[in-house]
Amino acid sequence: MTTVLFVCTENSNRSQMAEAFARMHGDGLLEPHSAGSRPSGTVNPRAVKAMAEVGYDLSTHHSKSVSEVPTGPYEFVITMGCGDACPFVPAVERDDWDLADPRDLAPPEFNQVRDEIESRVKALLERVNAG
């Protein structure tokens, strides 16, 4: 199983949704985790609502730091716009998905970020499948 860690600043929006999509679409190919460089402690209610709209329940998830997930090394570490604030985590391959933080966006714009994350997770799965 391919291990992947999604990292953003608060682990309350982008990385949570990426982990959720990896679980939804991964068909057991991925072991996904998510964390934040400065976790907020909670998942944004907007993210919970946005993911509920596509059939995933984030309501029981919580925001966590890198120290709360397995130490790796991971096959993939995907950072999401946290720049220099992203902690170093050992990985075979690293990528930065420069995605805007949707935290304060209106639902239509928030959902655009959600949909972009889903698209990128699906592309990552295609890479893993092509392996």
Would you name each region that the model predicts?
Residues 8, 13, 81-87:
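Functionally engaged cysteine thiol sites
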Residues 50, 79-80:
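Short alpha-helix boundary/capping motifs
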Residues 68-69, 86:
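Structural motif
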Residues 76, 82-131:
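Phosphate-binding/catalytic loops
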Residues 1-67:
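Conserved active-site segments centered on acidic
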Residues 71-73:
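Alpha-helix C-terminal capping/helix-to-coil transition sites in glycosyltransferase folds
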